[in-house]
Design a protein with these regions (language model features):
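Beta-strand-rich modules
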Residues: 50-75
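Solvent-exposed loop/turn segments flanking beta-strands in beta-repeat/beta-sandwich domains
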Residues: 17-32, 36-38
Length: 85
């Protein structure tokens, strides 16, 4: 997964490659990744991109994504992180 930011305060842009068989993707975000309970689910995505808005500027955010098929849920991606502009 790749995270980018532009000059848009409070926004991050996530992009990932397709997962074979995935019909949608679960995306989770947190500011303290060592604690599993800190992750918050975002609205599922059906594409390989996601815009996360209304984030606190100057905070580091961590995201992960996984593919979801009709029969199963895949493993979480490696964590990606970025400081919010």
């Amino acid at each position: 997964m790749r995270l980018t930011s532009n000059t848009f305060a409070g926004k991050l842009f996530a992009r990932w490659g397709p997962v074979k068989g995935a019909k949608s993707y679960e995306v989770e975000i947190c500011a303290d990744p060592p604690v599993e309970e800190n992750f918050h689910s975002l609205t599922p995505s059906t594409s390989g991109t996601y815009v996360i808005e209304d984030l606190a500027s100057a905070t580091r955010q961590w995201l992960r994504v996984r593919g979801v098929s009709k029969k199963s849920v895949g493993p979480w991606s490696q964590l990606a992180n970025k400081v919010v502009p």
